[in-house]
Amino acid sequence: MRAKLSNLQSIPQVVAEMTLDEKLDMVGCYRACHTRPIPDMDVPAIYLMDGATGLNGTHVVLDYLTDPCRADDPRTAYATPEMVALNRVDLNEAAAKYKGDALMTDLVEQAAKYRPGGRQHISFPSGINIGASFDPITAETIGHAVGQELRDAGVDVCFGPNVDIARDPLGGRNYEMYGEDPELVAQTAAAFVRGMQSAGIAACAKHFLANNQETNRNTTSSNLSKRVMMELYARGFEAAIEDGHVLCIMSAYNAVNGEFTSYSKKLLTDLLRGELHFDGAIVSDWGAAGQNKEGTLAAGMDLIQPGPNDMTACKQAVQEGRLSEEVLNDRVTHILQLIVEIKQNQRHIPAPVSYTHLRAHETPEH
């Protein structure tokens, strides 16, 4: 009988008794939005999903399609057009339209678990609107409401808030950000995180670091001095860590001073862990790890998203000594710490009834 995950003190023994494949599956994500469960060690899966303005329906369907238990090659699900079409229609209409289509019927049934009565989920105020209130209490209240909605849907980690700085007026995701002033962003982000995590789920502040434009976001480099980095671009993350006690942080696609954030030990380990004293889980933006997964793990990444990932090269790197198993153990430890903290919080915070179930968004007050 192997060790059981029961609290933070149990983690070292659990890690020591996990197999190499289990560790790699843990850091490589089990399916699009789930980590790998290990039932005989009482390690549950956790559900990670967008977003800070409400439940992401595409993620719900994609996660279902990438379940290894129902797909020969889960990675083919990312090319499934049905999941996009499904989120654009009323589920009652979809059930009638796709009657007789086994795949679509399955998807409709799965989506219905998250969309009561076939209705769309609530769309909460975007970041730029929350920032414009200049009111941390409002930010905390909205954060708590979003957290309740996501927790009711079974989500454990929300990919948000976006604590980047709105620097480019043409930035395609400025609406997610709280504004261009670093102190406004810092105070708003910390409040939103506190509110969300008070509902019993983990917030995931993103995108670390200096991710401020959509144009060429996978190849561009944000070149900046250390002072500008700390006083402007890192300020929101610093506040989310110190004042919000955020449990998770997501890396970015872009490079900083010529080094891509997902492969940067300077950013993920030296800055985020060292100078900003973050002790939670670091996750990659979707696809940011690319093919060099051992490189991103060595730099400080804990969870490579989205899953399922082929970890064969990482396994070979460990076996050949190019990636230390101690490094891998450290990454797994951070994920298990996140799982324990979430589940402990959920035991002490009553499960909510969602706003969608209550139809609260149809009231004059909302």
Model-derived segments and spans:
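Glycoside hydrolase catalytic-domain context in secreted enzymes
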Residues: M1-R359
